[in-house]
Design a protein with these regions (language model features):
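Conserved SF2 helicase motif VI
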Residues: 136-158
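Conserved helicase motor "Helicase C" RecA-like lobe of SF1/SF2 P-loop NTPases
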Residues: 56-109
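Feature representing long, continuous alpha-helical segments
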Residues: 49-53, 78, 82, 86, ...
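Cytochrome P450 core scaffold surrounding the K-helix E-X-X-R motif
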Residues: 131-135
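Short, glycine-/Ser/Thr-/acidic-enriched flexible segments
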Residues: 30-31, 78-80, 114-116, 129-130, ...
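Helicase-core coupling region on the C-terminal RecA-like lobe
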Residues: 1-57, 118-120, 151-154, 160-207
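A short beta-strand element within the Helicase C-terminal
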Residues: 110, 114-130, 149, 157-161
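Eukaryotic intrinsically disordered and solvent-exposed regulatory patches
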Residues: 9-12, 57-60, 108-111, 144-147
Length: 207
C-alpha cells in the first residue's frame, strides 16, 4: 500500500508507549517562566531540563528507530533556545558522551521561525509561558500562525511541553490543542529518573 492509503505508514514502535504517541502534552505543573529584563524574552528552566531528558530518553529507549538528527526541539522564545542549547551541551558533557556523534545544539534546537519549512520525525515544543496570574496571558504563544508552524513540523510525533494551568487560559490552546492530546502529568525535577518523570497518562478526546 502507498503511504497515503496505509494508516500504518506513519506508525512507529514508540507510539505504543506512554508519552511517545503521535500527539502528547506534558504538563509541567511546577514550571515557572522567567523574563529577562534586558531582552524581555522568556525562559523556563523546568521545561528546559525536561525537554533535554525527554529527547535523550527517546533515543536511548528506541535506538533502532530514532535518530537524534531527526529530532527537533522548537522554542517559542529566543531565551529558551539559548537555555536549551546550554542544557544540551551540559548533558553531553555530564554523561561523557562524544559530542562528535551527536548533532550540534544549533541544528536541533531552534525558534519557531528557525524551523519554518523544515520537518523532523519527532518534534518537542517548549511553550515556555507559565505564570499563576491568569490575567497575564501567554503572549504570542497563542498566535495562530506561530502555532500552526510549530505544530506542523513533526512527521511522526508531536510532543508539547508546557504548564497546562497557564496554557488553558488561552482559548486557542485550551479548546483546540490540550483537550485533543494525550496528557502526561510529569515531574520537571531534573534529579528524578526518566521513568519517574513520565507520570500518569490520561486519555483525552481524539481528533
Amino acid at each position: 500500500k502507498s503511504g497515503i492509503s496505509d494508516p500504518n505508514a506513519f506508525r512507529r514502535p514508540y507510539h505504543g508507549f506512554t508519552g511517545f504517541s503521535s500527539l502528547v502534552f506534558y504538563d509541567i505543573a511546577a514550571g515557572q517562566e522567567q523574563q529577562c529584563s534586558r531582552s524581555l524574552s522568556y525562559s523556563n528552566k523546568e521545561e528546559a531540563a525536561f525537554c533535554i531528558q525527554l529527547i535523550f530518553r527517546l533515543c536511548k529507549s528506541f535506538k533502532t528507530c530514532v535518530d537524534m538528527n531527526r529530532i527537533g526541539v522548537i522554542c517559542m522564545y529566543s531565551d529558551q533556545v539559548r537555555l536549551l542549547r546550554e542544557r544540551y551541551k551540559q548533558f553531553l558533557a555530564t554523561k561523557k558522551l562524544d559530542s562528535n556523534k551527536y548533532p550540534s545544539a544549533d541544528s536541533i534546537i531552534r525558534s519557531v521561525d528557525g524551523f519554518q519549512g523544515q520537518e523532523r520525525d519527532v518534534v518537542v515544543l517548549s511553550t515556555v509561558r507559565a505564570d499563576g496570574n491568569a490575567k497575564k496571558g501567554v503572549g504570542f504563544v497563542s498566535d495562530c500562525q506561530r502555532m500552526n508552524v510549530a505544530l506542523t513540523r513533526a512527521k511522526y510525533s508531536m510532543l508539547v511541553v508546557g504548564r497546562k494551568s497557564s496554557l488553558e487560559n488561552s482559548p486557542v490552546w485550551g479548546k483546540f490543542i490540550i483537550s485533543r492530546l494525550l496528557t502526561v502529568k510529569s515531574s520537571p525535577a531534573p534529579s528524578q529518573s526518566h521513568a519517574g518523570m513520565m507520570g500518569v497518562l490520561t486519555q483525552k478526546k481524539s481528533f
